[in-house]
């Protein structure tokens, strides 16, 4: 049976890429596309919006009216909107792939609670390469982490509204967990003025926002006399869109539970 997918935030940069990814993938079809209430894009054909021609799926601002047209919702929007969509999906037994970043602890708790009822893949980054980098960071941290300074440097386009990026935070969390540290107490997100000498157990973060950078992340493991850098650079949002569709297909036979791309890609068995 073909998996029917809906896209939230269909008119955004990521939403349009997701429409393209669904259209080009095997075993899935676009069932619905959504925009915020009152958007000028409501009624527009989703395929024409994404530049791939007429698909016969009109953008809607009402999930309830479209609920019989999709099995799974892919959501890369804003935390407040995603939380509303989660409530709808729980009430209507719809699976979710969530790529929204910037959730506070209450938001993360809501996602975990929802996963008791429905199947969710929630990840800060859906790139296969980035998720492989997570595993490489764990290995590097295990070998070098207690003997070097660790810094996470990330760059994104000028329109990104949260900092550091969800991916950068995930990188820090993978490193911290490997080293038995708590990122909340060991993460350093701002340095200015007289900061004093750097502590060995800090995990530092630096953020760049400029132009149209899709996404770049580099982690330094810096020791005296040498430095190891692990980097990932994305040149197109399609890498994230294709990963999200892959995650959706992986969820097809899952009834409930909270998963991430480590599960989708089976990286724990590397």
Curated annotation (Swiss-Prot):
GO annotations of cellular component type: cytosol
Molecular functions per Gene Ontology: 4-hydroxy-tetrahydrodipicolinate reductase; NAD binding; NADP binding; oxidoreductase activity, acting on CH or CH2 groups, NAD or NADP as acceptor
Annotated positions binding (S)-2,3,4,5-tetrahydrodipicolinate: 157, 166-167
Keyword Lipid biosynthesis included in the entry's annotation: no
Record-linked Pfam families: DapB_C, DapB_N
Database matches in CDD domains: DHDPR_N
EC supergroup of this enzyme: oxidoreductase
Primary residence: cytoplasm
Binding-site positions, NAD(+): 9-14, 35, 99-101, 123-126
Subcellular location per the Swiss-Prot or TrEMBL entry: Cytoplasm
Keyword Ribosomal protein: no
Catalysed reactions, semicolon-separated: (S)-2,3,4,5-tetrahydrodipicolinate + NAD(+) + H2O = (2S,4S)-4-hydroxy-2,3,4,5-tetrahydrodipicolinate + NADH + H(+); (S)-2,3,4,5-tetrahydrodipicolinate + NADP(+) + H2O = (2S,4S)-4-hydroxy-2,3,4,5-tetrahydrodipicolinate + NADPH + H(+)
Disulphides: none
Sequence positions that bind NADP(+): 36
GO biological process: diaminopimelate biosynthetic process; lysine biosynthetic process via diaminopimelate
UniProt EC number: 1.17.1.8
Associated pathway: Amino-acid biosynthesis; L-lysine biosynthesis via DAP pathway; (S)-tetrahydrodipicolinate from L-aspartate: step 4/4
Active-site residues from the entry: 156, 160
Purpose: Catalyzes the conversion of 4-hydroxy-tetrahydrodipicolinate (HTPA) to tetrahydrodipicolinate.
Family: Belongs to the DapB family.
Protein's name according to its UniProt entry: 4-hydroxy-tetrahydrodipicolinate reductase
Organism: Haemophilus influenzae (strain PittGG)
């Amino acid at each position: 049976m073909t998996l029917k997918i809906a896209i939230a935030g269909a008119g955004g940069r990521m939403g349009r890429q997701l429409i393209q990814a669904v259209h080009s993938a095997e075993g899935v079809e676009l069932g619905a596309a959504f925009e915020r209430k009152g958007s000028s894009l409501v009624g527009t054909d989703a395929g024409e919006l994404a530049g791939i021609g007429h698909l016969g799926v009109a953008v809607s601002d009402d999930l309830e009216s479209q609920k019989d047209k999709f099995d799974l919702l892919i959501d890369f929007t804003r935390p407040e909107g995603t939380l509303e969509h989660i409530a709808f999906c729980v009430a209507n037994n719809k699976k979710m792939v969530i790529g929204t970043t910037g959730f506070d602890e209450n938001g993360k708790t809501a996602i975990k609670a929802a996963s008791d009822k429905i199947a969710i893949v929630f990840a800060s980054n859906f790139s296969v390469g980035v998720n492989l980098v997570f595993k490489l960071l764990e290995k590097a941290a295990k070998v070098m982490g207690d003997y070097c300074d660790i810094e996470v440097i990330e760059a994104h386009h000028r329109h990104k509204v949260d900092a550091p990026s969800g991916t950068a935070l995930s990188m820090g969390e993978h490193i911290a967990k490997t080293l038995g540290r708590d990122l909340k107490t060991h993460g350093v997100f701002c340095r200015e003025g007289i900061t004093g000498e750097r502590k060995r157990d800090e995990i530092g973060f630096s953020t760049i926002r400029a132009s149209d950078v899709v996404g770049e992340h580099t982690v330094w493991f810096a020791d005296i006399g040498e430095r190891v850098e692990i980097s990932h650079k994305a040149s197109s949002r399609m890498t994230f869109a294709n990963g999200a569709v892959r995650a959706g297909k992986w969820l097809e036979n899952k009834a409930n539970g909270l998963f991430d791309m480590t599960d989708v890609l089976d990286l724990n068995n590397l």
